[in-house]
Design a protein with these regions (language model features):
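Juxta-kinase regulatory segment immediately upstream of eukaryotic protein kinase catalytic domains
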Residues: 1-28
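Active-site Asp-x-Gly
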Residues: 165-166, 178, 209-212, 217-219, ...
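Hydrophobic alpha-helical segments that form the core
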Residues: 276-289
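A short helix-loop-beta-strand connector motif used in the catalytic cores of GNAT acetyltransferases and
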Residues: 38-40, 204-209
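Conserved catalytic motifs of the protein kinase core domain
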Residues: 47, 103, 208-209, 230
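ATP/Mg2+ or Mg2+-diphosphate-binding catalytic cores
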Residues: 2-5, 287-320
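ATP-binding pocket architecture of kinase catalytic cores
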Residues: 30-175, 179-182
Length: 320
């Protein structure tokens, strides 16, 4: 946690920052809920909108991997800036000082269309299925982007990557395990570390680093064309890294329509099944730890603990 916790940005200060960045005097501000980092929608007279993000309140407990998301998103947008078929939004401003808003902030855009969470209640089951299929197609295109090494995208700016997916995955899992240990959550920590070590060979079968968005599928993150029922982009690329695309949360419990859009899902051979259970282990562990750090009433922890138990049982039975 930063030594000087960010204060809540003043709306007038946000408006001035938006006007300067977008070179427009007509910028309306709307604070959005449902996001870890504080988000404001900046709307101009041109019909597009932009997103301004600042750090969470100092009362919000962050996990290790949730720090530095503004810088991570800026890097992701730069990496994807040559792919207009994937990302129409661009990095407008990254200000890592606290002088202007009392917190570092990022502005990205322009975004066309609607945030899926805003329009979902008004859509028919057929429209929702079309959007799920379109999301699968979008993720397939994202997954085609190759990187130089496994690990953070920021390795292109001097951060060392790894040539081992097994090592990278173990490092990512270890970060969440330590968050759980710090909070004294009752979990089988050493058993989880052990199953990752025992299934290292299955992870090492992944040799080509590809673009992964770890946290992709939330309705608040997906931008859609509500008339044509298709996905046009994402609101947040901060969880991007180079790894195995099947680790993304959109493969945690995919719908049939998503699977139709993406194509073949990884449930064929033994190594694929082992990797998928390892990824279920990661996401269910993350859900349990996150619930402890930031309690909610959505019942996520109980289901996540069941998934965690199932993954551990399958991985223990399938050990080599």
């Amino acid at each position: 946690m930063p030594s000087n916790p960010p204060r809540s940005p003043d709306v007038s200060a946000i408006q001035r920052a938006g006007q300067d960045a977008l070179q427009s005097k007509n910028v309306s501000i709307e604070k959005l809920s449902g996001y870890l980092y504080r988000n404001c929608r900046l709307t101009t007279s041109k019909g597009f909108f932009y997103i301004l993000k600042t750090r969470p309140s100092h009362n919000c407990r962050l996990l290790r991997h949730e720090e530095g998301r503004l810088e991570a998103e800026a890097c992701a947008l730069q990496v994807l800036s040559t792919r207009p078929d994937l990302v129409s939004a661009r990095l407008i401003v990254l200000d890592t000082t606290t002088l202007r808003l009392g917190s570092s902030y990022l502005i990205s855009g322009p975004f066309g269309g609607s945030i899926f969470a805003d329009v979902e209640p008004s859509l028919s089951p057929q429209a929702l299925a079309s959007i799920d299929k379109s999301l699968g197609q979008y993720v397939r295109r994202l997954s085609s982007v190759a990187g130089p090494a496994f690990g953070p995208l920021r390795q292109v700016q001097g951060y060392p990557g790894s040539q081992s997916w097994a090592r990278t995955f173990a490092t990512m899992l270890e970060s969440v395990l330590r968050d759980g240990e710090d909070a004294l959550i009752n979990l089988p920590y050493e058993a989880m570390r052990d199953v990752v070590r025992r299934h290292r060979a299955s992870l090492e079968k992944i040799t080509q680093p590809k673009l992964v968005l770890l946290e992709l599928s939330a309705d608040e993150n997906v931008i859609v064309d509500a008339k044509n029922h298709r996905v046009t982009g994402l609101l947040d690329y901060a969880s991007a890294f180079w790894g195995d695309p099947f680790m993304s949360d959109c493969f945690y419990k995919p719908t049939a329509s998503f699977a139709e859009g993406f194509g073949k899902l990884p449930n064929g051979d033994t190594d694929e099944r082992i990797r998928q259970y390892l990824y279920v282990l990661y996401h269910s562990l993350l859900a349990v730890v996150r619930q402890c750090y930031r309690p909610s009433e959505d019942g996520e922890e109980l289901e996540a603990r069941r998934d965690l138990t199932t993954a551990m049982r399958q991985l223990s039975a399938g050990s080599r």
